[in-house]
């Protein structure tokens, strides 16, 4: 069931941080993500703005190594977090669909049970929660309004902050 308020402590304790996410990458898909991570160069001024605006928020990332868009977007986001570790973020990986069951979007396990707490439709998805655990914005698959991930996240925070 989709929650309106999420337990921040639970999310932080049941997920992985960026260093562990990168460390656990393996196989061909993992190598592609690592290459994309190394290559990504965020816009420094925008990244600084994101770091400032992100204070008090938690970024929750759902992804899978096999996912084409995840290999790009999650690698870029991970690079941003490595450069700005003050941006509070957690990662859930290993998302798998349930193609043989039309009543279930994501198969749990192997997908983490937290997929059912969010209205997760596609991956990658980056949810932004306020300090109370309320969803204030999301980015699904790729930036929709801005050319780069960091600009899109600033845009989402600006909209939420009014």
What are these regions (language model features)?
Residues 62-63, 77, 85-110:
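Thiol-based oxidoreductase modules, predominantly thioredoxin-like and allied folds used
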Residues 54-65:
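Short active-site neighborhood of thiol/selenol oxidoreductases, capturing the structured segment around
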């Amino acid at each position: 069931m989709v929650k309106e308020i999420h337990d921040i402590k639970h999310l932080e304790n049941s997920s992985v941080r960026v260093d562990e996410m990168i460390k656990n990458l393996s196989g061909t898909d993992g190598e592609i993500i690592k290459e994309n991570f190394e290559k990504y160069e965020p816009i420094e001024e925008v990244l600084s703005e994101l770091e400032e605006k992100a204070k008090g928020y938690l970024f929750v990332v759902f992804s899978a190594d096999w996912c084409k868009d995840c290999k790009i977007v999650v690698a870029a986001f991970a690079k941003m977090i490595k450069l700005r570790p003050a941006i509070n973020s957690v990662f859930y990986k290993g998302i798998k669909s349930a193609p043989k069951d039309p009543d279930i979007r994501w198969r749990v396990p192997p997908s983490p049970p937290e997929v059912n707490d969010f209205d997760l439709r596609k991956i990658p998805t980056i949810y932004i929660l306020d300090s109370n655990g309320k969803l204030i914005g999301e980015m699904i698959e790729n930036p929709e309004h801005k050319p780069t991930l960091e600009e899109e996240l600033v845009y989402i925070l600006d909209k939420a902050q009014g």
